[in-house]
Amino acid sequence: MLYSGDANLTDEQIAKLPFDLYRQGYEYYWKTHAHPNSTFKYTTSSLLDLMRFDATDHIALVNKPLLMIAGSKADSLYMSEDAFAKATGTTDKELVRIEGATHIETYWVPQYVQAAMDKLTGFYRRTL
């Protein structure tokens, strides 16, 4: 079995990563919130499958209420906007941008988590 992905970066190398998503993601998943049994490695075949996967391939088939949440400063915001535009199977849809949040910060920064939870609570009350 062939594995990929064990970067084992120093703090200096992490600080030099060019995008918040990678820098904060490495800190979050590798340092502050890593599971003790996680190796941070993927089987190479799984990584290749993940790289080929496109979550928007069939998003037009979604015909139920859709709520998408993204940070306004997220490096990945363009992906959410693209997916939202392609979600043509429903008119009951909303893309919420959490002001000031990056992608990873929406996981743990209290005011960003609260903003997401408030939106989700209202959405689920209305749609479930």
Predicted regions span which residues?
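Alpha/beta-hydrolase
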Residues: 1-57, 64
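Conserved alpha/beta-hydrolase "acid-adjacent" motif
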Residues: 51, 70-82
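Structural motif corresponding to alpha-helix initiation and N-cap regions
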Residues: 52-56, 77, 110
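Active-site phosphate/pyrophosphate- and oxyanion-stabilizing loops and adjacent acidic/basic residues
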Residues: 56, 81-85
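Short, conserved loop/helix-junction motifs that constitute active-site signature segments
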Residues: 59-63, 86-90
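Short beta-strand/loop motif that positions the catalytic acidic residue
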Residues: 62, 68-70
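Catalytic histidine neighborhood in serine/cysteine hydrolases
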Residues: 88-104
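Catalytic active-site module of serine/aspartate enzymes centered on a nucleophile-bearing elbow/loop
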Residues: 99-128
